[in-house]
């Protein structure tokens, strides 16, 4: 998967979850009487900046690390941040942050990382996904030289790539247009609201 699919589809999924959670029938039912002490929970307010960060984080770190900084050692764009170990650490850190500070930003990052793994089908690459159980990451020598050409070719020839990219683009276009029309770009930048 490329940038648009990771960003757009993850953003759309998080938005759908937020709207579903905030549209519970429980919130719309009147109290049964004075003895009914049900209190509607506070609405979920997602900070989409952290969702986007989590969705892009594995590629933001692993691609430069494997192709630019350490191409002779790693020669792979899916390394440390594409492993189950990283996902587990991210989720545990999110839970600790939430428990200690009642802050949701770690959960949002973990959600973004999880969706990144799902879209990359990481379980299909057990050497990377289960690292370090199977030893070192597989090397793809020479890939850095033709990576841009290969990405462009794959983008236009593989439906499993260009369809999610197109969907991600449309979702990002929808949210960007909406933010501009409603003049909420600043609110998104400062508070992560859509």
Annotated model-derived regions:
Residues 1-194:
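N-terminal membrane-targeting hydrophobic helices
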């Amino acid at each position: 998967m490329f940038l648009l699919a990771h960003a757009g589809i993850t953003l759309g999924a998080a938005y759908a979850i937020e709207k579903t959670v905030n549209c519970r029938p429980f919130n719309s039912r009147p109290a049964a009487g004075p003895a009914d002490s049900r209190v509607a929970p506070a609405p979920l307010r997602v900070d989409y900046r952290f969702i986007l960060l989590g969705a892009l984080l594995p590629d933001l770190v692993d691609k430069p690390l494997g192709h630019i900084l350490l191409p002779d050692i790693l020669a792979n764009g899916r390394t440390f941040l594409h492993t189950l170990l990283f996902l587990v650490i991210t989720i545990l850190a999110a839970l600790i942050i939430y428990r200690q500070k009642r802050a949701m930003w770690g959960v949002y990052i973990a959600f973004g990382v999880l969706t990144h793994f799902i879209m990359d089908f990481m379980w299909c690459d057990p050497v990377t996904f289960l690292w370090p159980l199977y030893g070192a990451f597989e090397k793809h020598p020479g890939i850095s030289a033709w990576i841009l050409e290969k990405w462009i070719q794959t983008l236009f020839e593989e439906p499993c790539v260009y369809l999610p990219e197109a969907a991600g683009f449309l979702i990002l276009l929808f949210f960007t247009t909406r933010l501009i029309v409603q003049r909420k770009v600043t609110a998104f930048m400062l508070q992560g609201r859509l």
